[in-house]
Amino acid sequence: MKGSLIVAGCFAGGFIAGRLAEYSPEWLHTASLWLLYLLMLQVGMGIGSDPKVKEMLRTLTPVSLLLPLTTVAGALILTYPVAFMLKAVCVTDSLAINSVCGYYSLSSIMLSQLKEPLVGATLAAKIGAVALLANVVRELIALTGAPLIARHCGKEAVIAAAGVTSVDVCLPAIRRWCGERYVGLALVHGTVIDIASPFMLTLFASL
């Protein structure tokens, strides 16, 4: 929860600074690109050095892969009616935003970089902001709504709602409201989405 609020605060501060600035400095694009590279490096190092990887591999079965696949499929299917109702972001960009299932840091930076050559810096920044806010809100809902989701929708639904954060931020909530036996499934779920997110986002952003 605290981490999500810090992210939202940083976004608000950056937005205000951008509005007050008379122009966007040339180094900003280069800096954000290198931040993206460092983020991808951190993702790989985080997965490789995680001591829970062995536990995850022990619980890895073909059946356990169905949950992340279902999570992503559900997010993409629900994108269509929401995108048509809101009309703020086109369907393909909405698919890119939802395909990462809560990975706000990756989606905001990477989507802005991918869309800038296609739609310009201003619109790309707006799309990145929508990606950030949408995925932060998803994480907050998963954290605060975990007990209700577990009670009315089932334990697996808590993991699905957490999306990629089932491997880190939402893991304590999953352990508390779902039980220890769901921890391994949560790790597999979050890691699979973590690995697949950059590829899915790139695919939909290029459409």
Where are these predicted regions, by residue range?
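Entry/N-cap segments of selected transmembrane alpha helices
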Residues: 51-80, 127-140, 185-193
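Helix-coil boundary and interhelical linker segments in multi-pass alpha-helical membrane proteins
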Residues: 19-24, 81-92, 113-130, 204-207
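Long hydrophobic alpha-helical segments typical of transmembrane helices together
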Residues: 178-207
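Alpha-helical transmembrane segments and their lipid-water interface positions
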Residues: 36, 40, 142-146, 158, ...
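Small-residue-rich segments of transmembrane alpha-helices in multi-pass membrane proteins
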Residues: 10-15, 37-42, 64-77, 97-109, ...
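Cytoplasmic-side transmembrane-helix entry/capping segments in multi-pass membrane proteins
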Residues: 2-5, 32-33, 58-70, 93-100, ...
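Alpha-helical membrane segments and immediately flanking helix-loop junctions
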Residues: 92-141, 149, 153-188
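Structural signature of multi-pass alpha-helical membrane transport proteins
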Residues: 1-56, 62, 69-85, 202-207
